Amino acid sequence: MYAVVTGSTKGIGLAVLRQLASEGWNVAASSRNHEDLQRVKLDIESLPGNPKCFIHTVDFSHKEETIRYGQHLLEELPQIDLLINNAGVFYPGSVHQEDDGVLEDTMALNLFSPYHLTRTLLPSMMGRRKGHIINVCSIASFMAYPNGGAYTISKFALLGLSKALREEMKPYGIRVTSVMPGATWSASWGDAPYPDDRLMPPEDVAEIIVSTTRLSAASAVEEIIIRPQLGDL
């Protein structure tokens, strides 16, 4: 089985990659940082079972580069069973104060890149009448919060893309799952003054995501909401 995970060198993406590989999946990892990808490849391919890890340096904020990556995957991999659109960006700011261009930059990575990558890979899945697409959205996909202007807009839109794909892909046997995690530990939190149990470990989110791939073809998990036990920050 072959899985494609974008934004897969840290946080939720890396945790998902490791969980999949530990369960026998071969994985394709992508990031803008080639050194990080090389480190991930060594880590993944050292796991029991000798999983393969295909790495590619990609800037998903560029449409043409995203499409080229998808086309390369179709040539390199024997099939694509699972696509996890995880790459994303967050720029804090309110709609009326954020810099000009922040919305466009945020939408390019959080919405347009999964849109174009999914469209590139879908014909292969549809031809096989088999596949699974998982979009890593956010609790910001259904609720707004202060200082989350462009990010909230982009994540609402990503959930809309997921819902549209879910309806379109039912006849083709392709499952579509939207995952809405709350605050999850990652490097982006830096030295944030929170105790360990205030944010979720990415491994918990990864376990939930990967669990949806174990179901029979008769079942589909449409949406998952996972939050810190103590609630949102």
Predicted regions and their residues:
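Active-site helix of classical SDR
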Residues: 118, 154
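C-terminal helical subdomain
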Residues: 171, 178, 194-233
